Amino acid sequence: MKTPKRIGILTGGGDCPGLNAVIRAVVKTVINDYDIAVVGFLDGFEGLVENKFIKLNSDNVSGILTRGGTILGTSNRADPFRYPILEAGKYVYRDRSDQALKTFEEHGLEALVCIGGDGTMAVSQKISEKSIPIVGIPKTIDNDLFGTDVTFGFDSALTTATEAIDKIHTTAQSHHRVMVIEVMGRYAGWLALCSGIAGGGDIILIHEIPYKIDSICETIKQRKYQGRYFSILVVGEGAKPEGGEMVVKKRVEGSPEPIRLGGISHKVADDIEDKIQVETRVTILGHLLRGGVPSPADRLLATRFGVSAAQQLAKKNFGHMVALRGSNIVTVPIDEVAGKSRTVPLDSPYLSMARSLGTCLGD
């Protein structure tokens, strides 16, 4: 079977630690093992539509293993099938997928590596139907991508969140306060749950378990009766009260994910103060969780994903995403991943562990 001689690569969606590590692994492996040339498209699918690119080689991916972000740039507003175009002072949306295909063909490419989360995989599935062979690589700090046990980016974000919680502990103890720490995660509670457990959180609120403010307040009061005059509350941005709604910070027109969550921490803190008159403070970690040097675990996982993706290219195993199952790297069809998310199951051992530790989950 003849291996491809020229491939493209892009990074889509939000950035996270480990993107450069996976770019490096793909480029080095396809060059060293298969003598394949690589074109890197800039700013996600925007680069494919607008023909913005750089040629990648062993020299320009050297030294990027530990660098955060992505040397290719990224975008979560560049869906080729609903592409934003400024006309008469406002944005309208057009199908420019034919232009993406034209760019692909003009470069003489035989396959495209798409690195991203659920939105990127959904677009990758659609664009593969236009005769662009795809290999997908999963990334997200939210760990919510269906089909893989873990995504790179998650461990780095978990480390950052846990270190922040560790630091907040000391000021919480000193001032006898309830400290509310909000983390990202969208509609999946993995980051809040795992950082809450790792950081010794007393209360953890996630999207999958609607919370009762009375349950939270009772936990805080019980801790006070036991001589613990502070509490650490970790809340995922997608958490919501029982019978209530998530807090939406804003809506971004034209984005594949138009709803921007944020601010649930302020609601929780205000409700606690109103009900039991204890001093609360809010810390929203936000984009801090996306930045910085990837953890060693993420560097290793990203490298494994990149090498495996290169091998799938050589075998022409297109239409698949590399994934981690247990300790093994496997492939799963992208059409089984697109449009699905991986949330915390209610029988998760992490939830059972938290309850065994006496952690309040808001229910």
Model-found features: residue ranges?
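A cross-family phosphate/adenosyl-ligand binding-site feature
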Residues: 1-12, 22-108, 119, 241-246, ...
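Nucleotide/pyrophosphate-binding catalytic subdomain
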Residues: 21, 29, 35-39, 43-53, ...
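Accessory alpha-helical/coil subdomains and C-terminal extensions
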Residues: 102-103, 111-116, 122-126, 133, ...
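Residue-level signature of catalytic and energy-coupling elements of molecular machines
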Residues: 138, 196, 286, 309
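A glycine-rich phosphate-binding loop feature that marks nucleotide/adenosyl-phosphate handling sites
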Residues: 182-186, 237, 287-288, 323-330
